[in-house]
Amino acid sequence: MSHSVRYIRLLPIIVLGLVLASCSTPTELPHTPAETAAAAPPPPIVALSPEASVATMQLPSGYRLEPVLTEPDIAEPVMIAFDGNGRMYVAEMRTYMQDADATGEQAPFSRVSRHEDTDGDGVYDKHTVFADKLLLPRIMLPLDDRIIIGETNTDDLYIYRDSDGDGVADEKTLWFKGGPRGGNMEHQPNGLVWAMDNGIYSTYYDYRLRFGADGKAMKEEIPVNGGQWGLTQDDWGKVWFVNAGNETGPVHFQQHIIYGQFSAPDELIGQYKAVWPLSHVGDTQGGPGELRPDKTLNHFTATCGQDIFRGDRLPAELRGNLLFAEPVGRLIRRTLITVDDGVTHLANAYEDQKSEFLRATDPLFRPVNMITAPDGTLYIVDMYRGIIQQGNWTQKGSYLREQIEAHKLQREIGRGRIYRLRHENFERGPQPHMLDETPAEWVQHLSHPNGWWRDTAQRLLVLRRDLSVVPALEKLGARDSADPRPRLHALWTLEGLSALSDKLILRALKSTDAQVRMEGLRLADARVRAKSTAHTALVAAMRGELKDADPRVTIQAMLSVRRAGLPDAKKMIQATAAASNSVGVYAINEQLWDEANNEDPQLIRLLGVNGLKAYRSGRTLYGSVCFACHGTDGHGAPKPGADGRTIAPSLAGSPRMLGDERATIAIVLHGLQGAVDGVDYGAPMVPMNSYSDAELANVLTYIRNSFGNRAPAVAPETVAARRAADAGRTNYWTLAELTSQIPALGVPRALFKRRAEWKLAANMAARDNSPLEAMLDGDPKTGYFTQDVKPFPLEWLTVELPARSRIVGIDIDSRGEKSEAGKEIGWAPVYSVEISDDGKTWTMVDAKVVGEPHARFNLPAPVEARHLRIAITEKDSWQAWVIKELNLYGDEK
């Protein structure tokens, strides 16, 4: 994919208060080459003026940046939002990382400020503190003359209002009671977006909100989205998420998140994860492995602040593109989005040139957010500071701390800039005055070429609930046109007003425009799912769309009939996939029936009711935080550009996870540094002690019983006890230190390989002369089968090893045998495990091991023995014992 582009340097020439551009190459700030870094310390990095900083930035020809708001009017800006009159609200995290230890970060001294352009010249000349004394504000959503604000460490959302027009909020009302929020501030919700479907989305939440007819918050559970910092939607209402921790960038973008997390083959084109910065300051938490020899970042590590550009005052080539920031790389990525055969593909617009849309040599350029503005341009939020990572990643002894201190990055705080991206061929658009307009005028704005105007008009119409505009909306919602976007906004506005008819949905499903048919399906599945009436015609139309010629529509029909809860949905979807040659249709079908949330039916027996509740809560936390490094499958997220390497260790079969729970609790509370099982992953496992005891217990319970793992649930009280015992600890653990406290961690968890030398015995008669040795042949189709088990409870199996060995785990695979009713049989509900040195005198190790078709139990502590006895101690409805494969784990001698 080739895009010819000329680059310009932005120079500090002020004309009418604007920064204009001049053709040149970017100015290089002083930096220390990699080969001489050890010889002499680099010079301290110092702040530049906004104009001088802009001069270090590189953009494609014709584009330029102009500062619209800077220090001292703002400090530490992290996000912006505009109300219906174009007033800009800025969330300022004024206590964020004021030194390398995050001293005072949790003090409520942050704010949301409001800024107005009173004369329409594009310069913000009126500044007020709208809401003060906040704890690191991270959520803003303007409504009408009100705005929702959310702070750190809570999921509560408040509505603020300025009733007297002085620019300072004097009313504060709780709108949504979410309760306290644990976790590091980098792992908390952000980016409240009112999407086209009238759902209000944020990162991390496994639910969406919406305004009810009475103005109260309504909550609906949806899949975890995997987003981290920043949120945006495209012209069709799909919400886009970006994650920093998994070093991938955009995640779960194939379909709207309400239908699940989906991926597709080759969805990222070429070397999409590779980045091409100009800055040579290697301050990445991943260490030298994240850098090229010249100390430039080599791939994503801090992606955030995304926007689908939907404005009308920049070149058409930019519209519909996904842009997001990489503040560690001091750059902004421009992503081209294409859809082929039902699969969405992403590509770096400048991959052929090994370049980026915007990049700077100024090391303090820290873009963290961007947004399509009311004037049709793009606004970029630059936190402009030294340290960008939170304190958990900058602890003493870390590689990142060394870089911070070497470059004196901790000194540069308290600034911030907001830039407007302009192009030489376009003027700014007019300032809106929607809050002073009528609902009828808002309906007209649904046809505006700037997506910000359309979104704002829809939101105001739904909030006002003035039904006098319904006829105008129905007319717009029924009309086919070259641009389907106004029609879709009209349909969803009617939905938000509870005034949408089945007739209009059916008309949308018959549209010649594929995008309209897709939205018709979404409207239909929401209507049918509500089960307010039979909606027979809608159901029939949804079934019909499974045969649509456009694979995008076919996929949406598959998702919609499933979400609508049609009784024969699975049969219809699988038949559709079987008849289709579309890659996208095939990929979606495969994932629809293989979701991570499909729960093992044995968990209720293994964990009990309370343990299962903990497991489910932990699954949500894992899916929103832990997956980024450890992967959705628990085997470690692949590291970009490093074949076979992962960002973090595998959790599947991990001795820390499956052994003494004190070890894994210690790690999540205070982190882990250094090599793990002989592999150096570069970055440490950071402390998670800002999460509550219950949250940590839940996520550990989930991990210990997922990815092939089996271990008892972790109790919150156990986490609390370990937290209290290590209360004075401030540094990371190392495995050596943990092993000195818990020697069992030093016992290998290797698969025993001398099975051919094992001697087996059992006191049960074999069925069909099946040999005991069949459980050791590595063939899951063969095994040892007993006759009906009698008498009870004296059934046992013994194993004599070639030599005395240390045993940490046992694996009994009984899968594959089913009763006439289709129930899995051949396994015992409870076992006991005993050991002996002579095969005569036995010592109990675990008297109550819960069984299952594939029983994987880990002993409470490593044991050393030559003889092992596994006995059945409880009897259920099964009649015989089946062992297809038997394996032991530990240190075999």
Question: Where would I find each of the regions flagged by the language model?
Answer:
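Beta-propeller domains with acidic blade repeats across secreted/periplasmic ectodomains
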Residues: 25-441, 452, 460-462, 533, ...
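Flexible coil segments in periplasmic/lumen-exposed cytochrome c-class electron-transfer proteins
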Residues: 31-32, 41-44, 601-613, 679-756, ...
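Disordered, acidic Ser/Thr/Pro-rich linker "stalks" and the adjacent N-terminal cap
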Residues: 46, 51, 746-804, 815-827, ...
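The canonical Cys-X-X-Cys-His
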Residues: 370, 381, 418, 618-633, ...
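Gly/Gly-Pro-rich "capping" loops immediately C-terminal to redox-active cysteine motifs
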Residues: 406, 634-693
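Structural detector for internal amphipathic alpha-helices that build alpha-solenoid repeat scaffolds
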Residues: 429-432, 452-465, 485-499, 504-510, ...
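Short beta-strand-plus-loop segments that form exposed binding edges in beta-rich domains
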Residues: 871-878
